[in-house]
Amino acid sequence: MVNRNPKRSDEPVWWGLFGAGGTWFAMLTPVTILVLGILVPLGVIGPESMNYLRVAGFVTSIIGALFVIGSISMPMWHAMHRLHHGMHDLKFHTGTAGKIACYAAAALATVLSVVFIFMI
């Protein structure tokens, strides 16, 4: 028989954030590391393009703020989802408390990144 009142799961929400975070981490984080961690220190990109006023101007624009918030929060959602399911795979059955702790840490990182961006 078909269950007419199936129990709803919140897992699609977490899988969506997991997928978005993984995509962000795979596509945008390497480029960010290349530019900020390799090309600027080697002088390929001039230091005048990364002075405080230009970087602060970028971060305070809407696209820059969204980029910084995404760079902090999206990989965090990915990592916390992976940690939650990794604990389950390793037979650390923390139940709802572990789930809440993992996703609360990701939510806290997201909220703090938004707060700190608006403080600039």
From Swiss-Prot:
Principal place of residence: membrane
Pfam families linked to this entry: Fumarate_red_D
GO biological process, one term: fumarate metabolic process
Membrane topology: Multi-pass membrane protein
GO cellular component: fumarate reductase complex; plasma membrane
Keyword Acyltransferase annotated: no
Keyword Transmembrane helix attached: yes
Family stated for the protein in its record: Belongs to the FrdD family.
Functional description taken from the UniProt entry: Anchors the catalytic components of the fumarate reductase complex to the cell membrane, binds quinones.
Protein name in the entry: Fumarate reductase subunit D
